[in-house]
């Protein structure tokens, strides 16, 4: 068996199928398991998804005390425990890097109205 076949089998076995469909512009909360020495704790990150790469890596941006902070998460890692989508936004770009230069209300995105089918 080739090493590439082995790597593909391992990657498929670790793939998490219960992830919600995340798109750029969504406001999400990501819960991450952090190990510090012998202790483990759960930390929660919330922000706007400004980029998405190959269904696996997302970049989340939020403003904290007037400073923009960006987190990059690989969604297939076992440290990412859960992802919840708070809100969808209406956008027309695949990357939202222009939000880095905006401050205040100009950095907000328009809400997308999601219809509920009965």
Curated annotation (Swiss-Prot):
Chief place where the protein resides: plastid
| Places the protein is found | Plastid, Chloroplast
Q: What keywords would UniProt list here?
A: Chloroplast, Plastid, Ribonucleoprotein, Ribosomal protein
Tell me the domain of life.
Answer: Eukaryota
- What is one GO biological process annotated to this record? translation
Which PROSITE patterns does its entry note?
RIBOSOMAL_L19 (PS01015)
Q: Which residues form the signal peptide?
A: none
Q: Which family does the record assign?
A: Belongs to the bacterial ribosomal protein bL19 family.
Cellular component GO terms, alphabetical: chloroplast; ribonucleoprotein complex; ribosome
Q: InterPro entries given for it? A: Ribosomal_bL19 (IPR001857), Ribosomal_bL19_CS (IPR018257), Ribosomal_bL19_sf (IPR038657), Translation_prot_SH3-like_sf (IPR008991)
> Which molecular-function annotations from GO does this UniProt entry contain?
structural constituent of ribosome
Write the protein's name: Large ribosomal subunit protein bL19c
